[in-house]
Amino acid sequence: MSHLVKMENGQSQTIQEMLGCIERYNPDHLKTLEAYVQDQAKNNTYDLEANLAVLKLYQFNPHMLNFDITYTILLKSLTSLPHTDFVMAKCLLLPQQMKDENVQTIIDLADILERADFTLFWQRAEVNRSMFRHIAGFHDSIRKFVSHVVGTTFQTIRKDLLKELLGGIEDSTLESWIKRNGWKHQGQGLVVVAMQDDKIKTKNITEKIEFDNVGGLMAQCL
């Protein structure tokens, strides 16, 4: 859905155009930006700059604070891990937002993800599933982050452990994630995450430098 922002002169701008000028701080545009946040949740899209602009407008206009939009922005920023979007969003929160129980729950979920305690995350996510039910693709976005961590941590991993880290998914769903990441079955319940030949190999390079090559440079430094 295309969101247009109505200017005082009667003309319209796209949200991206509006964010590039001083109009991004105009509270008259907040409702349009909030609707844009809701569309991101519904359509599995993401616009960090617009979402941060909403939080900044809340800072300037605390009386216009919308907690539901705040939750959605924070949860959408989690779907961007391992990028630092959540940290940036968190830094813009007002004291009353930080004191909110749901905000604290989301912050706890973020901490758990950053510690890579994925089993605990899925347990907490199940308890709080109503919080992000409206965010399309949320679970798969987190699984993408889990896959990133697994890919940088393991060479091989037990199939049952991988299934647990991805949220206790069905075998058919696990197979699709294995295929998506280019992993392979090894047998004996193991999944090959990274072949040894795929690992970057270090190489020592020795370069012989003659004194005549650097003598002039050293003389200039004296």
From Swiss-Prot:
Can you tell which superkingdom this protein's organism belongs to?
Answer: Eukaryota
A single GO cellular-component term from the record reads:
eukaryotic 43S preinitiation complex
Which key words tag this protein in UniProt? Cytoplasm, Initiation factor, Protein biosynthesis
Q: Which Pfam families match?
A: CSN8_PSD8_EIF3K
- Listed GO biological process terms: formation of cytoplasmic translation initiation complex; regulation of translational initiation
Describe the subunit structure.
Component of the eukaryotic translation initiation factor 3 (eIF-3) complex. The eIF-3 complex interacts with pix.
Protein name as catalogued = Eukaryotic translation initiation factor 3 subunit K
Originating species = Drosophila yakuba (Fruit fly)
Question: Top-down, what is the taxonomic lineage of the species of origin?
Answer: Eukaryota, Metazoa, Ecdysozoa, Arthropoda, Hexapoda
